[in-house]
Amino acid sequence: MDFFSTSSLSSYYHLIFTILAFVISSIIYFLSKKAESKKLKLPPGPPGWPVVGNLLQVARSGKPFFQIMRELRQKYGPIFTLRMGTRTMIILSNADLVHEALILKGQVFATRPRENPTRTVFSCDKFTVNAAVYGPVWRSLRKNMVQNGLSSIRLKEFRAVRKSAMDKMIEKIRAEADANEGVVWVLKNARFAVFCILLAMCFGVEMDEKTIEKIDQMMKSVLIALDPRLDDYLPILSPFFSKQRKHAMDVRKQQIKTIVPFIEQRKKILESPEIDKTAASFSYLDTLFDLKIEGRNSTPTYPELVTLCSEFLNGGTDTTATAIEWAIGRLIENPNIQSQLYEEIKKTVGENKIDEKDIEKMPYLNAVVKELLRKHPPTYMSLTHAVTEPAKLGGYDIPTGVNVEIFLPGISDDPNLWSEPEKFDPDRFYLGKEDADITGVSGVKMIPFGMGRRICPGLNMATVHVSLMLARLVQEFEWADPENTRVDFTEKLEFTVVMKNTLRAKIKPRM
């Protein structure tokens, strides 16, 4: 191809203008940020390059981000600053600082920072419980989810759905074990069960396995499309990521195309219940059709309904499923804990199948789950916070527009808060040697679900799902390593913190 053809010249000039724009914008941005930072007392942190900040240092280190956080915490203390391109992150990794920010100064630290353009599209301009800025939209959405969608009364209405999903999970595990000399994949089976429950709760109908798989694959595509990209931190580079943006928009279109038929189906069922007598009398979606949003005259649009339903499904699936995988891994590693849990189950229900009403009578199960959430919180970082107005924390300035991140292992692994924090030990809770309020209100020692005004609204549902699923799995099967293997507890960050090598376990039926 002739380099000096019209199309080549066009591409050439586009590249030149992009580079010039980058250089000029970088100089302006750097000078403005430098002037601004001189006026503020930000927490300490590693020195960075102009414009890119610490972005290249993090990328070139070759280390997992959580390992970098641990090293920076050791060097700079419990509160430090990291500059990632145009984003400034202030990381908290100390219980007292987190309590001050999210409880004592909770209203100031209750909002969310700006999103990248891709996330803004998928969230319908922050129209979700988790992403909404602190204000009327967030209040309306959260109040509806807590009071109408996930209240204790509503959760009880889906007991039959949870029982059915547990039974199907056990059947699938038995069939897989029969075909593979007793060896099964833990995460895959747990994820399927949780997703079945959440689909039924969201849309009010039970679906066949093929439909469930179709929706699940679509939801995974959404999570992949939302993975951070370089242009999220350096927007000036966005012209070089047009292909990725187009792919993300295609995923969004597919998301809407997949979910809207279920929204329309549910609307028809509410208008004419006789068309599907197997449908549930209530679903989370029902609460959204006529939802009044403070400050708005209109009810949610179809794209907004798709976004809210997707939040409901994605928010509770991987977090619960990965918790189960970690739990089974810990029970394999500690057969004495597994045996004690099984004995409590037998003592509580005898030969009957364990039901969720039995969970409250099982203190050792509750201790195992609590220790699981301490040792293996769903993520390394809580959902990002931001301040509604300039604030002070730990003697430092917290300006608006920065990302306030909470590094959870800095708290749950703190030897000043826990005895032998590296050890998986349910007895710390069961024997009353230690305790922790997982909501963080009375003090911060572990915050697997966030805390304060932005605490996860699905906290109660998640603990029920994890407790019930773990109890059923231990009641039905004895869990062990496959021959010549050991559980690998190496971590990897995906949407949640997962096992780097997905857990395969050998089961022996008990019942």
UniProtKB/Swiss-Prot annotation:
<keyword id="KW-0560">Oxidoreductase</keyword>
<dbReference type="InterPro" id="IPR036396">
    <property type="entry name" value="Cyt_P450_sf"/>
</dbReference>
<keyword id="KW-0479">Metal-binding</keyword>
<dbReference type="InterPro" id="IPR017972">
    <property type="entry name" value="Cyt_P450_CS"/>
</dbReference>
<dbReference type="GO" id="GO:0020037">
    <property type="term" value="F:heme binding"/>
</dbReference>
<dbReference type="GO" id="GO:0004497">
    <property type="term" value="F:monooxygenase activity"/>
</dbReference>
<keyword id="KW-0349">Heme</keyword>
<protein>
    <recommendedName>
        <fullName>Cytochrome P450 77A2</fullName>
        <ecNumber>1.14.-.-</ecNumber>
    </recommendedName>
</protein>
<dbReference type="Pfam" id="PF00067">
    <property type="entry name" value="p450"/>
</dbReference>
<dbReference type="GO" id="GO:0016705">
    <property type="term" value="F:oxidoreductase activity, acting on paired donors, with incorporation or reduction of molecular oxygen"/>
</dbReference>
<keyword id="KW-0408">Iron</keyword>
<dbReference type="GO" id="GO:0005506">
    <property type="term" value="F:iron ion binding"/>
</dbReference>
<comment type="similarity">
    <text>Belongs to the cytochrome P450 family.</text>
</comment>
<feature type="binding site" description="axial binding residue">
    <location>
        <position position="456"/>
    </location>
    <ligand>
        <name>heme</name>
    </ligand>
</feature>
<keyword id="KW-0503">Monooxygenase</keyword>
<dbReference type="InterPro" id="IPR002401">
    <property type="entry name" value="Cyt_P450_E_grp-I"/>
</dbReference>
<dbReference type="InterPro" id="IPR001128">
    <property type="entry name" value="Cyt_P450"/>
</dbReference>
